Amino acid sequence: MAKNISTKQLSVLEYIYKTVNAQGYPPTVREIGSAIGLSSTSTVHGHIDRLQKNGFLEKDPTKPRALEVTKLGLDALGVQDKNPTIPLLGVVTAGEPILAVEEATDFFPVPPEYENDSSNLFMLTIRGESMINAGILSGDQVIVRKQSTADNGTIVIAMTDENEATCKRFYRESDHIRLQPENDTMAPIILDNVTILGKVVGLFRDNIY
């Protein structure tokens, strides 16, 4: 069973999910109570509130009865998300390393070719011009597959010992690691150690003319 969810809350979540799928809108509190054997509407409200608090349900404050099962809720039910998304986790530099951001600021639909691997993907917005020769421009959003190792020459998102992240080509050499920009005017970054957060596998670009 998923963490922070009781058996009764799971029953509430499942009934909401099935009802929304069947009729396009969520059940009433009384319908939920009747379906799972709870006569007290306040008890049902309590379960719904806890499901929201723990991230299994979302409620649109502008619409009455607008409840939506979140990805966390779908995971708790063992249901695969029909519309998987990739979280945008902030900005990473294609220049000097900057502090990494790990909270999602937006979500993008998963391209069809990555649907089977969507849970291992995240996105970052690029700032800087050190990867322009690889076709990665400032303002692009790169798609990154989570992995902790990389072959030489792979474009990666790497984290330094100072917890700063950068987008570069990765090279492990005899006594150091070289993070190589794709810009002839910029020098490589030479480090003793880095943590690879993932491999760049694609990108989105909004400003194509």
Curated annotation (Swiss-Prot):
SUPFAM superfamilies: LexA/Signal peptidase, Winged helix' DNA-binding domain
InterPro entries: LexA, LexA-like, LexA/Signal_pep-like_sf, LexA_DNA-bd_dom, LexA_repressor, Peptidase_S24_LexA, Peptidase_S24_S26A/B/C, WH-like_DNA-bd_sf
EC id: 3.4.21.88
GO molecular-function terms, A-Z: DNA binding; serine-type endopeptidase activity
Catalytic reactions on record: Hydrolysis of Ala-|-Gly bond in repressor LexA
Keywords on record: Autocatalytic cleavage, DNA damage, DNA repair, DNA replication, DNA-binding, Hydrolase, Repressor, SOS response, Transcription, Transcription regulation
Enzyme class: hydrolase
Any GO BP: proteolysis
Gene3D superfamilies: Umud Fragment, subunit A, Winged helix-like DNA-binding domain superfamily/Winged helix DNA-binding domain
Active site: 130 (for autocatalytic cleavage activity), 168 (for autocatalytic cleavage activity)
Chain positions of site Cleavage: 94-95
Disulfide bridges in this chain: none
Start-end of DNA-binding region: 29-49
Function: Represses a number of genes involved in the response to DNA damage (SOS response), including recA and lexA. In the presence of single-stranded DNA, RecA interacts with LexA causing an autocatalytic cleavage which disrupts the DNA-binding part of LexA, leading to derepression of the SOS regulon and eventually DNA repair.
Family to which the UniProt record says this protein belongs: Belongs to the peptidase S24 family.
Subunit-level organization: Homodimer.
Name of protein: LexA repressor
Organism: Pediococcus pentosaceus (strain ATCC 25745 / CCUG 21536 / LMG 10740 / 183-1w)
Gene that encodes it: lexA
